[in-house]
Amino acid sequence: MNDLVIKKKERTYLKSVFEITWENLSPIFDELAKRSIGSATELEQWLRDRSELDALLEEDFAWRYIRMTCNTADEALLNSFQYFATEIEPKVAPLNDQLNRKFIESPFLTELDQSKYAILIRGTKQALALFREENIPLQTTIQVEQQKYQGITGAMSVTLNGQEYTLEQAATFLKDTNRETRKNAWQSISNRRLVEKDTLNDLFNTLRALRHQVAQNANFDNFRDYMFAALGRFDYTAEDCFQFHEAIEKTVVPVLAKHADARKKALALPSLQPWDMEVDTSGKPALKPFKDGAELIEKSITCFGKLDPFLGERLQAMKANGLFDVESRKGKAPGGYNYPLAETGAPFIFPGSKEQYNGVTDVTDARLLARHAVWSEKDPAGTGRRRAETLQSLQGAERRSRCEF
């Protein structure tokens, strides 16, 4: 047996070869909805079968999203993603709600092992409380609209010293010891973004209105409160976040102000500009711990392998199975994410890597998240958690890509 071959989980309920069309999916949902359940054991089997269906859909959607973000300029990949978003998900949503209700209303629910199923039950009840039929077309539109951002930003590039760079690649010049080089890079990046200012502002306003309507339809005052519920944030509230923000303002901001003053003095500048914030104050050139994506992957595997041989082996297998895309290039979506693949039992890692130290931290963050996916691949009750965690990962990637420059 080749340890580098990652085998997908064997299906026991669905066909081993399954084309995602509504004609193929509809009978499966119908059988799950109509199946008679006469005991806790049968309820668990129903959950396993439903989880298998969820895993099939999640991984199919995952690969459509991954391929699209790897090449935002490929219209066929965009159409493939949009087919799922517009033709499959809107039909699946009400049936998922029906299956959620069947699960929660089962007389055998209380007989399940609560230590194993409590989180799944809690999340399913939350999904039932949030579901609104009128939100299905809105969420479909949101799915399609928000991908326009990646297409627009993925196409951005600048020319520095006669060579074309993606914005992430150009950001490496912000660490250059020559101030004019840094200034030119920062202004070039900013000016390129400003070209799309009106387009991106219009897109933001469109999405804001759609998301606010989704929240109001679900009886929330705003989208923030709706997403706290949708992401399953049961352990802290928006008020907790506000208190944390205030604590940062009182304790961290003054420290950062002192650091900025020290930086200004060390660089012997009358005032700090945005292009002065990343250069080494000692005058040393920027760290360049890897020359390309292949070396970044190899060094990361070696590092993690020394921490935990099993994790190193799994990352080596992920590399062999093409589960990394770490190079920055034109047409690649900005930001980074770790996308769990429900049937494969391993994630796809898509960091916004640059040939500098930040690239190492991006990949390290992603692989620490990947460790969770690797170790939880056999969890039969993990579907709801996978969905919420993936959504948080992708939204975090979008936020980071917007805030980086």
Q: Where do the PLM segments sit?
A:
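Zinc-dependent metallohydrolase catalytic domains
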Residues: 323-333, 340-342, 368-405
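A well-structured
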Residues: 1-291, 297-302, 390-404
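Inter-helical turn/loop segments and adjacent helix faces that build the functional surface
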Residues: 238-239, 262, 266, 307-310, ...
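Structured ligand/cofactor/substrate-binding pocket environments in proteins
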Residues: 141, 145, 196-199, 308, ...
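Active-site-adjacent bridging/hinge elements
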Residues: 120-122, 224-230, 271-276, 334-347, ...
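Short helix/strand-bridging catalytic loops that position acidic/His residues to coordinate divalent metals
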Residues: 228-235, 352, 378-381
